[in-house]
């Protein structure tokens, strides 16, 4: 795709706003859009950039980021992996926070490592974050000093570096999947004569094992410098004070003399097409990707009105093509199960973009799938897109923008921060949602659809299958799997390019979702309910609980529940039950098959899906206030007229079969299957779905089960939470819920009392694998009548063990990259507690890790927990609890749990957290875990592992 030609064609069509002038290369010149006026933006004399914004969601919280224009592409050959290694070292000792004090300080104020405190490294950037910090003068200053130390104060002590080598090794081991290995092997071919082909961020383990500490220090001094660093602070803070503190703290950092030149490494154009096909024994499925490479937006366009207009055109075009491809998948003879079109960076590089297609071919249909997808692109290049397609894509795009705009005063910090990170790293515009909304309003109201069509048609005529064209295939390496050759794929592309095709016909159903509006039923009573909800009892027996909130001006949540679920159906139907949610959510509704329904709902932000729990029938959905009627129409159709969409069913089964056939050989799948079967003693209700099981599935039986479970909403409790008009809600409830047929009595719960295995159970098994790795899951459990206190204690036990294992297994032992525990006490069909510990580990260290896992539990049984550990848990939980009070989903879950199970999870929760004592956790371990003695351990080792 030639961006320059598209810009000029759009300019000629007057799709772009009037340009100020045309430069010597014929490019339209436009002024840069100003940064959002609510953002304090500046640059220190040393070159460091900062962004500060006051925002009160969440209240009394702030987030702190530092973005570095440095990634693995800056590494020399002998440094491969140092950018990522350096990211790790930022948590292992700095000028103001030696040792592990960054993590210790953050967790002491309720900021959890991994969840709120983290970082990532890619080819072109490294970004660090401290999220959801409780604001106080001390906390804010400390977080700014953490950012300062990341920028210019790492200690990089040799002992800490040597410890971290093992951690990096375990991260590499954990991430070494089939797709990652294929990508690493293929990058040099996908990026000929480009540094991006040799700079996968995890690096080379030979470098990680052997680099000298001084080399890492030199890399840090060379690249972590003010002109490449951006500070972002967003939250409930005083902007003037933060700006002054940034100036005070960061201004002393000196720009290095004779600083190394910062380069944007190019991705050279390729005159000949690139075809890369690779396979791996642990690749889960066959995948094809097609790329039409192009240059990124030129600097003179980036950050201007034109960037929005180009983005609008490209995204509409991609949406139209994706919709066509999705429509094709519903045909029985379609050679692919799924496909989608998008525009983004070319794989891992910022200096080259690409239009790309993602294809999941059906087994043995790879060349046919590629040919079919390419034919659709050829069809667009020959005939263009239709105006009706564009209207739908435009309406859907605009409805998403409106949803954000209507909630513009209630956006969380997490909404703003990525915008400023991208502005700093890539020059993306950030004028604010008010300006963006005006831009898109103008594009949808002032630019005729015919003109949009003309511009998009031009865009798709620019794509060559020779120059800058790439086809990349990733395949399983297994007996009987036919991997296509590059020549076969090339022939498929060439044949498609020569095809003379008919124009696409856009078949649209214009009838209403609900052709005949049902006769209204009655609301027979109204009563106050718990947590500020109101309950309407309907004439047919249904109950509707609703709570109007001001948390999110663009959100209305729906949940509906009834006793029933899978346990009401024979285990002979287990495969049909396993498929139930996917099938009934992917088929159509009423008179609309799935693709017809998608077209009908374009521009509507409303959805509604059914699901079967073990003992409950469930319906969940959401809408904007504007689309509330549509949500109710979907509810009505879910109960009264599900669609007999056999094409959608057949496509889903074909997709699942191809995925499962390949996945069954994967070590991760074997481990997951073994964990489930060991815990539940091979009970057929907890059997992992296999490809062969799909032959026993029946769409007719699934529809029959659906009719049994969702014949009417009269025995359901419906919950609506969010920003709605109560009069409208009343009207829609009377029309679409109260009108459903009544039932003689509500169903009661059927509980089969399926419990985990009792006693001490060990399952150690081996599997062939490409990268030797071990996995451990350990589950402690027992029956326990539920109390809020036990729930808090079990949660605290999991969190504190996670911190201990992080220290003993990861930091001190270098045995694992990711290790943790999660505990809880549960009400519902079974009242019980459970503690689950997970640890992907170096095979040689499995026994040592198991000993440390057991030691962590025994230490708490004998000594309890420390005051510091307890305080960290309490800080985080109380902070998290306060934040939840402003979430619609939190309140909806509360009322649903209370009505269904009789437990109030709100009243007294803060007191239960604040009153928690070390002996509570100690006694829980002694009196439940150790006394009950139910401990299930599942471990997987490589087949060729020798002690």
Walk through the language-model features, giving the residues of each.
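Bacterial Sec-dependent N-terminal signal peptides
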Residues: 1-25
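Hydrophobic, small-residue-rich alpha-helical packing segments that form membrane-like cores
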Residues: 160-228, 232-234, 239-246, 255-264, ...
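Metal-associated gating/positioning segment near the N- to mid-region
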Residues: 89-101
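Internal metal/ion-chelating core segments
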Residues: 210, 214-242, 683, 696-735
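Proteolytic maturation boundary segments
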Residues: 22-52, 238-312, 317-322, 326, ...
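Active-site recognition of the HExxH zinc-binding catalytic motif
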Residues: 80-88, 92, 574-582, 795, ...
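M16 family metallopeptidases and their MPP-like homologs
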Residues: 51-53, 58-75, 82-83, 100-149, ...
């Amino acid at each position: 795709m030639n961006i320059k030609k598209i810009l000029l064609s759009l300019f000629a069509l007057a799709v772009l706003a009037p340009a100020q002038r045309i430069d010597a290369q014929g490019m339209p010149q436009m002024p840069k859009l100003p940064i959002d006026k609510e953002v304090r933006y500046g640059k220190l004399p040393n070159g460091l950039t900062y962004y500060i914004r006051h925002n009160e969601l969440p209240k009394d919280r702030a987030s702190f980021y530092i973005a570095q224009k440095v990634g693995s592409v800056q590494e020399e050959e002998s440094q491969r992996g140092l950018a990522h290694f350096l990211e790790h070292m930022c948590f292992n000792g700095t000028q103001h926070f030696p040792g592990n004090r960054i993590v210790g300080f953050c967790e002491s104020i309720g900021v959890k490592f991994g969840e709120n405190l983290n970082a990532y490294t890619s080819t072109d950037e490294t970004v660090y974050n401290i999220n959801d910090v409780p604001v106080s003068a001390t906390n804010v200053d400390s977080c700014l000093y953490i950012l300062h130390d990341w920028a210019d104060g790492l200690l990089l002590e040799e002992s800490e570096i040597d410890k971290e080598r093992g951690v990096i090794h375990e991260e590499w081991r954990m991430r070494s999947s089939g797709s990652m290995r294929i990508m690493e092997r293929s990058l040099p071919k996908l990026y000929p004569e480009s540094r991006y082909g040799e700079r996968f961020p995890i690096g080379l383990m030979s470098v990680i094992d052997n680099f000298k500490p001084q080399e890492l220090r030199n890399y840090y001094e060379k690249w972590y410098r003010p002109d490449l660093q951006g500070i972002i602070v967003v939250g409930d803070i005083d902007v003037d004070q933060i700006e002054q503190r940034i100036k005070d703290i960061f201004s002393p950092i000196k720009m290095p003399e004779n600083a190394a030149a910062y380069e944007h490494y190019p991705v050279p154009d390729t005159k000949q097409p690139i075809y890369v096909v690779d396979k791996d024994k642990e690749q889960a499925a066959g995948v094809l990707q097609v790329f039409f490479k192009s240059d990124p937006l030129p600097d003179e366009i980036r950050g201007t009105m034109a960037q929005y207009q180009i983005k609008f055109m490209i995204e509409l075009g991609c949406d139209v093509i994706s919709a066509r491809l999705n429509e094709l998948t519903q045909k029985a003879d379609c050679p692919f199960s799924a496909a989608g079109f998008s525009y983004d960076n070319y794989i891992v590089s910022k200096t080259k973009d690409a239009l790309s297609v993602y294809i999941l071919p059906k087994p043995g249909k790879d060349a046919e799938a590629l040919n079919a997808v390419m034919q659709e692109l050829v069809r667009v290049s020959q005939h263009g897109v239709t105006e009706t397609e564009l209207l739908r894509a435009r309406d859907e795009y605009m409805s998403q923008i409106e949803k954000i705009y209507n909630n513009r005063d209630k956006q969380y910090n997490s909404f703003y921060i990525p915008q400023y990170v991208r502005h700093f790293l890539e020059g993306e515009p950030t004028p604010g949602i008010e300006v963006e909304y005006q831009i898109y309003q103008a594009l949808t109201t002032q630019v005729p659809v015919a003109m949009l069509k003309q511009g998009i048609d031009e865009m798709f005529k620019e794509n060559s299958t020779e120059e800058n064209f790439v086809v990349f295939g990733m395949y399983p390496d297994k007996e009987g799997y036919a991997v296509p050759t590059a020549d076969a794929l090339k022939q498929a592309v060439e044949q498609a390019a020569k095809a003379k095709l008919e124009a696409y016909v856009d078949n649209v159903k214009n009838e209403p979702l609900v052709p005949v509006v049902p006769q209204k039923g009655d609301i027979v009573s109204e009563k106050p309910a718990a947590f500020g909800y109101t309950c309407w009892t309907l004439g047919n027996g249904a109950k509707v609980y609703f709570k109007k909130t001001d948390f999110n001006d663009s959100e209305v949540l729906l949940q509906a529940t009834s006793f029933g679920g899978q346990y009401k159906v024979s285990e002979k139907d287990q495969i049909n039950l396993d498929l139930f949610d996917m099938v009934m959510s992917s088929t159509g509704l009423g008179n609309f098959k799935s693709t017809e329904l998608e077209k009908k709902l374009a521009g509507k932000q409303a959805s509604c899906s059914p699901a079967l729990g073990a003992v409950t029938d469930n319906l969940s959905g959401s809408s904007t206030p504007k689309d509330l009627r549509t949500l109710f129409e979907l509810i009505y159709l879910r109960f009264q007229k599900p669609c007999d969409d056999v094409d959608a069913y057949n496509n889903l089964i074909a997709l699942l079969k191809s995925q499962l056939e390949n996945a069954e050989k994967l070590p991760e799948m074997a481990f997951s299957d073994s964990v489930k079967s060991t815990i539940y003693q091979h009970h057929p209700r907890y059997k992992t779905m296999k490809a062969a099981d799909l032959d026993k599935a029946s769409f007719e039986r699934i529809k029959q089960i659906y009719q049994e479970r969702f014949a009417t909403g009269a025995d359901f409790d419906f919950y609506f939470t969010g920003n709605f008009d109560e009069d409208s809600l009343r009207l829609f409830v009377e029309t679409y819920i109260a009108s459903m047929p009544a039932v003689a009595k509500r169903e009661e719960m059927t509980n089969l009392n399926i419990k985990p295995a009792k006693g001490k159970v060990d399952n150690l098994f081996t599997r062939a694998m490409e990268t030797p790795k071990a996995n451990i899951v350990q589950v402690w459990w027992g029956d326990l009548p539920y109390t809020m206190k036990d729930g808090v204690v079990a949660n605290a036990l999991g969190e504190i063990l996670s911190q201990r294992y992080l220290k003993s297994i990861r930091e001190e032992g270098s045995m694992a990259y990711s290790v943790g525990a999660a505990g809880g006490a549960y009400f519902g069909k079974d009242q019980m507690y459970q503690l689950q510990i997970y640890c992907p580990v170096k095979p040689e260290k499995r026994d040592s890790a198991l000993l440390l896992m057991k030691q962590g539990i025994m230490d708490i049984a004998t000594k309890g927990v420390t005051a510091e550990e307890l305080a960290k848990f309490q800080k985080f939980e109380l902070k998290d609890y306060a934040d939840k009070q402003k979430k619609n989903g939190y309140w909806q879950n509360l009322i649903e749990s209370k009505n269904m199970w009789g437990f109030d999870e709100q009243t007294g929760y803060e007191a239960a957290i604040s009153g928690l004592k070390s002996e509570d956790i100690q006694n829980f371990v002694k009196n439940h875990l150790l006394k009950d003695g139910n401990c299930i351990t599942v471990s997987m080792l490589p087949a060729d592992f020798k002690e």
